[in-house]
């Protein structure tokens, strides 16, 4: 068992809140969760007050930087934001004064916290639901605490830092009877859902091969960083002990915060964990993929501190009902300075057909082939290869795609709708 998991499993009895250290964080996290932060306690579900359809929920937002800024502003359009929590005081200052179009300054009267344990201590009874948008290593700790207090949770992707954590959250959510969702914005796109329906309708025939790639990492990791960064002074606006949370203790370095923690094993999940949930979302949902029967991987610049500089991973999935076995290939990073991509022959075939797609059908985010230029593969996307055709998505989120060969699908008509749509995009 790794040191990281051991620290997350540890339970204590005393709770010294006033002066927060990392050790105190673990102690108090365990107590708030019940018998232990990772063990689902036996008391019945905490009942929430009955609310009418017109009554607004009281929501607390844990993490308000980056994606958390958008999540908190979005939820403020539909609920009362009663508390905001972040380890970065500069973010809190900006959020308290922020104006959201159409609703003014929804955060100016919200409770302000650096430590979500204290937030739950002081406002727990007035909180109905929580958004959690923090570094990966803290997803499970914050989410489990909220669940065990009977709060509904919206946790950003990836759901957790490892598989074991995800399984524990699933058990806790089921026992507590709360509503939960992982933030994965592409899933709400109408075009994404139509793509799922296209594949499941059989329009492409049986799918036996999928290729998914990303230009990530776009943050520093191997080969640039392959050992522990040296200690640096902690900025006065950053609460470093709270940022570390349940991770193994280490000194601060600007290499971690903000955003760049993704490439460190103790905090992030690398390119696959960061973008796989987006770029692989369409094929995984459409093909109803579960557990793979085998996984093969190769990667470069391996080390114990940071994620690899590049990788290729092949998953083999068994048949699912009438769907045949399928091989899913993942590509990330740069090898010898070149982005790792699907096989050249497949790429050439896809781009040749993509060039035939009428110009006005191409999305602004995709690379439109000019008359005198050869089209290039987008930096991220997916290719779903079926017996009757292919779906090419030059897009991170699967919300843009084209059916190839272009001539074969010239008169394309959408299949019957089987998935709900969100016309407002909320």
Predicted features, each with a name:
Residues 152-154, 159-237:
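A contiguous active-site-proximal alpha/beta segment in oxidoreductase catalytic domains
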Residues 91, 107, 133-137, 157-164, ...:
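Alpha-helix capping and helix-loop boundary segments enriched in small/acidic/polar residues
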Residues 58-62, 82-86, 131-132, 154-155, ...:
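Structural recognition of the beta-strand scaffold that forms the well-ordered cores
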Residues 52-54, 76, 106, 123-125, ...:
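Extracellular/periplasmic catalytic domains that process cell-envelope and extracellular macromolecules
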Residues 194, 206, 211-217, 221-269, ...:
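Contiguous beta-strand/loop segments that form the cofactor/metal-binding neighborhood of enzyme cores
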Residues 2-152, 167-179:
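N-terminal glycine-/serine-/threonine-rich beta1-alpha1-beta2 phosphate-ribose binding loop
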Residues 70-75, 94-97, 140-145, 165-166, ...:
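Short, solvent-exposed loop/turn and secondary-structure capping segments
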